[in-house]
Design a protein with these regions (language model features):
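Unchanged
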Residues: 40-63, 73-125, 149-151
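Active-site beta-strand termini and strand-to-loop segments that position acidic
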Residues: 13-16, 24, 87-89
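Charged phosphate-binding loop/patch that engages nucleotide di/tri-phosphates or the phosphate backbone
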Residues: 128-151
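Conserved N-terminal beta-strand and adjoining loop/helix that marks the start
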Residues: 1-20, 39, 70
Length: 151
């Protein structure tokens, strides 16, 4: 089955030993965690989309630094290619926002690696790779295998 394609961008933002993630409900009634992000608007690039989406979803302003992961997701209504960038916090504290609520986000928070043990997480690199390596300037961009997503 052919699906429309979507280009998206997301931020991987660390603070100490925790990463900034938002929680959604999936189509099966469970939940999943994902770095803040979303589809690019016609008038923006990947960096602008990450800054906008992170602010809308978490109230935190970030500065994207470098691409670390490219993810391909087969979703229920579209196929999505998503560019993930390591970001640094510029300002703000995590809190719920009106935009996040409208989008179906039920939580935004900082998560340690141990807290992700029994979670479905996007991008998978947050589970599959050492965070110190992911944050390193020597990290080589990874293109992840296609993955089915229940959203």
């Amino acid at each position: 089955m052919s699906r429309p394609h979507r280009i998206a961008a997301g931020g991987i933002t660390f603070r100490g030993n925790a990463v900034l993630l938002v929680r959604y409900r999936n189509s099966n009634g469970g939940t999943y965690l994902v770095g803040p992000g979303g589809a690019l608007r016609d008038d923006e690039n990947v960096i602008q989309a990450i800054v906008r989406e992170t602010k809308e979803e978490t109230a935190v302003t970030v500065r994207p630094r470098r691409v670390v992961v490219i993810e391909d997701l087969v979703c229920s209504r579209f196929k999505m290619s998503k560019v993930w960038m390591i970001c640094e916090v510029v300002e703000g504290e995590v809190r719920g926002t009106e935009e996040a609520e409208k989008e179906g986000i039920i939580e935004a928070a900082w998560y340690t690696r141990d807290q992700l043990a029994n979670e479905v997480v996007f991008p998978a690199a947050l589970i599959q790779h050492d965070w110190a390596q992911l944050r390193s300037e020597h990290w080589q961009v990874k293109c992840l295998p296609s993955r089915k997503a229940n959203f």
